[in-house]
Amino acid sequence: PGWHIECSAISLKHLGEHLDIHCGGIDNAFPHHTNEIAQSEAYIGHKWCNYWFHVLHLNTNSGKMSKSTGEFLTVSLLEEKGYNPLAYRFFCLQSHYRKSLVFSYENLDNAQGAFNKLLAKIAALKDDENEAIDEAAVKELTEKFKAALDNDINTSLGITVLYDVLKAKTNDKTKLALLAEFDKVLSLNLLDEAKKLKEDKKEEASSV
């Protein structure tokens, strides 16, 4: 029981008595989340969470990734191996949460390559103070991004909208504003990472 009670206590203390979205692994659905709901709502006297979603397991080619098998990832391990942890996040976001995701370093290499290419395209954008925000483009692309996330939190479709922004026939200032807004959901730190990539390339060029 302590496991269930501590989660209710922590979330009520730090997040308040009403949550919009609560997520977890598919193995948390029962009995952990059902117990959380029962005890939290009995305590606060009203509905606790609006939405629940449960992510399927991260697997390797040999099966489920878990501590018990000795096969699991940590951010520090990825960093030790030279990976940007945000590339791993990008890798995860490219799959739907209802699908089991197969991890391999080859797949992560592909994701990191794609993430770096995305950052390079963003780094090439220029924020011109004299340009005005294209409100029509903002409306169209924001609706497209929201539709992707409203479709059962389809993050992979949301990622494709980032590329739609980059290809859109609008000015760079608008593109940067849209990317910053969408990144509030995706948390890929796109603009800062793109700026860092740009600065690293300048340093490399100056050292040659």
Go through the PLM ranges and name each one.
Residues 67-208:
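Conserved nucleotide- and phosphate/pyrophosphate-binding catalytic cores
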Residues 1-125:
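Alpha-helical recognition segments enriched in aromatics with Gly/Pro capping
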